[in-house]
């Protein structure tokens, strides 16, 4: 690590994110430029842990909203993510880079892992904001982000990597998703107190990353064996229980079918035309022993027993709250 007794020279500061194109799914328009900007947080995101809310409409506290630390415009094509050992990066503002490099050179105590809270107070974090005109989703794992300071001394180069910012927190609450949108006319007046029933509009609004909808690709069993009969097919989901939570799960969840473009094509039904639901099963003696059970036998048999020739028909379902304006 360089110090004030050395003549190391600052080069750059980068925010690096790993991306393995073979395991990630890019959704949307990957043929046009998509723009992403990085900002520094001025304070922690406002959060009331005593009265947590599903949505927090507080303004995100940024150091300089009019001046991003970095701007990256890219086409989200596979070759973009297969270079440099499946890593891509934002080159951040040099003023911030020199500020952090100064901490490194004087070996400031806030860089000691034992003083993690001091560093969090000094450097609240970074946020990546997609442009409002973006038409694609870029899945970035916040736990894999790394902040790197690059420097050199003569012909020798060096890199100082800060701990992942989420690692400074004692829980995953520090990694968060900020969603901003302008609702269409149809949904402009919808709120928790003024919902729009699913049955009225026959529409479901999906918000990924918030736990409302789960897309599931079902395993495929070929129908090439005419002597095999599928008697029962069920999906069993076990809610993850946190000790500090006391929020009751809904008693039912609903299942939707998707087309090959991942668009909702309708509600899943059985052979009698009845909607298929998942029902919450609880154990009064063991609070943590609870699960949703969804019977999809009719659907599965209809998909794999009609002469697919052993070709996987891509069985995708969407599971979410039953008829709620999410």
Give, region by region, the residue ranges found by the protein language model:
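Secreted, disulfide-rich extracellular signaling modules
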Residues: 1-326
């Amino acid at each position: 690590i360089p110090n004030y007794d050395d003549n190391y020279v600052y080069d750059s500061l980068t925010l690096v994110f790993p991306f393995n194109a073979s395991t990630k799914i890019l959704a949307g328009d990957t043929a046009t430029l998509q723009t992403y900007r990085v900002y520094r947080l001025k304070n922690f995101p406002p959060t009331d842990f005593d009265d947590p809310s599903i949505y927090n409409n507080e303004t995100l506290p940024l150091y300089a909203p009019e001046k991003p630390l970095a701007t990256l415009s890219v086409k989200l094509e596979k070759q973009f993510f297969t270079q440099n050992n499946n890593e891509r990066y934002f080159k951040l503002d040099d003023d911030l880079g020199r500020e952090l490099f100064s901490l490194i050179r004087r070996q400031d105590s806030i860089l000691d892992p034992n003083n993690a809270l001091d560093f969090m107070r000094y450097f609240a974090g970074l946020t990546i904001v997609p442009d409002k005109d973006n038409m694609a989703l870029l899945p970035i794992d916040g736990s894999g982000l790394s902040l790197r300071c690059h420097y050199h001394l003569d012909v020798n180069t060096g890199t100082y990597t800060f701990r992942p910012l989420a690692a400074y927190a004692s829980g995953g609450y520090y990694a968060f998703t900020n969603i901003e949108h302008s609702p269409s006319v149809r949904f402009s007046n919808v709120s928790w107190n003024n919902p729009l029933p699913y049955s009225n509009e026959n529409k479901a609004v999906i918000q990924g990353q918030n736990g409302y909808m789960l897309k599931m690709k079902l395993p495929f069993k070929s129908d090439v064996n005419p002597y095999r009969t599928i008697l029962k097919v069920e999906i069993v989901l076990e809610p993850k229980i946190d000790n500090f939570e006391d929020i009751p799960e809904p008693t039912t969840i609903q299942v939707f079918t998707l087309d090959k473009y991942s668009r909702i094509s309708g509600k899943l039904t059985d052979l009698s035309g009845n909607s298929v639901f998942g029902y919450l099963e609880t154990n009064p003696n063991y609070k943590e022993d609870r699960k949703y059970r969804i019977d999809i036998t009719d659907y599965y048999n209809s998909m794999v027993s009609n002469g697919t020739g052993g070709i996987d028909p891509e069985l995708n379902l969407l599971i979410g709250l039953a008829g709620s304006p999410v």
